[in-house]
Structure formats: structure tokens, C-alpha cells
Curated annotation (Swiss-Prot):
Belongs to the GmhB family. The record marks 51, 100 as: Stabilizes the phosphoryl group. Keywords: Capsule biogenesis/degradation, Carbohydrate metabolism, Cytoplasm, Hydrolase, Magnesium, Metal-binding, Zinc. The record marks 99 as: Contributes to substrate recognition. Its cofactor is Mg(2+); Zn(2+). This is D-glycero-alpha-D-manno-heptose-1,7-bisphosphate 7-phosphatase. Pathway: Nucleotide-sugar biosynthesis; GDP-D-glycero-alpha-D-manno-heptose biosynthesis; GDP-D-glycero-alpha-D-manno-heptose from D-glycero-alpha-D-manno-heptose 7-phosphate: step 2/3; Capsule biogenesis; capsule polysaccharide biosynthesis; Nucleotide-sugar biosynthesis; ADP-L-glycero-beta-D-manno-heptose biosynthesis; ADP-L-glycero-beta-D-manno-heptose from D-glycero-beta-D-manno-heptose 7-phosphate: step 2/4; Bacterial outer membrane biogenesis; LOS core biosynthesis. It comes from the Bacteria. Its main location: cytoplasm. It comes from Campylobacter jejuni subsp. jejuni serotype O:2 (strain ATCC 700819 / NCTC 11168). It catalyses: D-glycero-alpha-D-manno-heptose 1,7-bisphosphate + H2O = D-glycero-alpha-D-manno-heptose 1-phosphate + phosphate. Mg(2+) binds at residues 9, 11, 125. It is found in: Cytoplasm.
Length: 172
């Protein structure tokens, strides 16, 4: 039987987006991220992070810096009894298959974990996240952004707590 997944963008969903975050001291978790993840873990979703990290290609930081921050982030999730199944990242600039809005990272997860994409969820903070989710045939696309964005193929919320309340009300 295929497994459901919750895909999360990193900057703007897991942590406050401060542009090219790669240092632990600059990494600040968004309010509600742990509660949201625990909710979906309790419903047998696998948890994945799919993040564009063009700061690597731009020379702002090294891939080793990204991995150090990932280790810190995963340890913080573990302290909250949350297991992130895998982090997918694109270190490139435009033009590659893995960079969102293309679906490369999401499709790689689908193949590696035999995921049921139609019953999976992707939460992102940019339209490129929503487009990537659409391109990967993910069933539920959620945009978390205080600025209203145009699009009819996703739902939009102002914050993670609103998203969690939405799913609790739907009893998903």
C-alpha cells in the first residue's frame, strides 16, 4: 500500500525566511511547525522537506554549511519526537530538474518511498512551491503567506496554526 506524505518547504514554512539562511544562529522555527508535524505523524504521514538552496550555487555558503544546519534542524525536530524522513534540496540555479517549480525533488521522494501523491500534502510559502506540487500531482497544495497570491489550484492561509485548524476541522 502506498504511503501518504507531508512535504514541507523549508524557508518560510519550517523557519522564518531571512533570505539565504545557513547559520544556526539565524535559524528560527516558525510558530506551529512542531504541532503541525506531530498532527500528521499521528495520521501516519511520512514527513519530507523539499527546499531550493540556490545560495550554494551563488557562493553565499557551502553545501557543508547547509548540511550542518540540517543536522541541527533534525535534532531539534527529534527533541519534539518528530522524525523527518528525508530532506531533498536543490543547490542549483534555474534550469535544473530538481529546482522548484519543477517537480524533481518531489518525484524522487515518490519513487524512493512509494508515495501516494494524490493523498499527500505540500505546504509552501511561494507560488513556485505550489507549481512544483501541481507538477508532481500532489493532491492538496497549501500556501502559507500573509500576502494574497493568485491561483485556483491551492488553498491559502496566513500561518501554520490556521492550517492545522483547517485540517482538524476536516478531520484529516
Amino acid at each position: 500500500m502506498k504511503t501518504k506524505a507531508l512535504f514541507l518547504d523549508r524557508d518560510g514554512v519550517i523557519n522564518i525566511d531571512k533570505k539565504y539562511v545557513y547559520k544556526i544562529e539565524d535559524f528560527e522555527f516558525c510558530d506551529g511547525i512542531f504541532e503541525l508535524c506531530r498532527y500528521f505523524l499521528a495520521r501516519n504521514y511520512l514527513l519530507f522537506i523539499a527546499t531550493n538552496q540556490s545560495g550554494i550555487a551563488r557562493g553565499y555558503y557551502k553545501e557543508s554549511d547547509f548540511f550542518k544546519l540540517c543536522d541541527y534542524m533534525l535534532k531539534e525536530f527529534a527533541k519534539q519526537d518528530i522524525k523527518i524522513d528525508k530532506i531533498y534540496h536543490c543547490p542549483h540555479l534555474e534550469g535544473c530538474e530538481c529546482r522548484k517549480p519543477k517537480a524533481g525533488m518531489l518525484l524522487k521522494a515518490k519513487d524512493e518511498f512509494d508515495l501516494d501523491m494524490k493523498n499527500s500534502i505540500f505546504i509552501g510559502d511561494n507560488l513556485s512551491d505550489m507549481q512544483a506540487g501541481l507538477n508532481a500531482d500532489i493532491g492538496t497544495l497549501i500556501l502559507v503567506n500573509e500576502e494574497k497570491k493568485e491561483g485556483d489550484f491551492f488553498r491559502q492561509f496566513k500561518n501554520l496554526k490556521e492550517i492545522l485548524n483547517f485540517f482538524k476541522e476536516k478531520d484529516i
